[in-house]
């Protein structure tokens, strides 16, 4: 579950990712539509959606293994956002699978702290969820 600002001031988009059958998805949609402040419920199809999450992970690091950690982060197109004498903080964005793979690579070094957001998503191509502006 993620709530995020949109291109329209005062309107936030809530992204809810569920693993459910069609009947349960319909029920969730109906319940969301009953909420007064909800303007619109849009169901995104996995094949036509770009979805990403962000993760910050603090990894134990010293002068001997820091280059390996940085190289591994670079392979995943992640960024080192903080370096301390005994740790490195890495910022990564991507699919849950990509983030899990990065964690798997960092695990042997020692994960000291981790926080991961839920996913945000948009349709691929020109289709938008926002009303068309003239």
Regions flagged by a language model, labelled:
Residues 1-13, 17-134:
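Long, contiguous binding/interaction regions
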């Amino acid at each position: 579950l993620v709530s995020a600002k949109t291109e329209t001031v005062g309107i936030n988009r809530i992204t809810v990712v569920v693993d459910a059958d069609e009947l349960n998805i319909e029920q969730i949609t109906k319940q969301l539509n009953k909420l007064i402040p909800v303007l619109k419920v849009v169901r995104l199809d996995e094949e036509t959606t770009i979805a990403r999450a962000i993760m910050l992970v603090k990894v134990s690091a010293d002068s001997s293994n820091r280059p390996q950690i940085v190289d591994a982060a670079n392979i995943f197109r992640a960024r080192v956002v903080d370096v301390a004498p005994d740790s490195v903080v890495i910022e990564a964005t991507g699919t849950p699978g990509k983030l899990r793979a990065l964690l798997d690579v960092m695990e042997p070094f020692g994960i000291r702290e981790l926080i991961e957001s839920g996913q945000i998503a948009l349709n691929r191509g020109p289709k938008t969820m926002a009303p068309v502006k003239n």
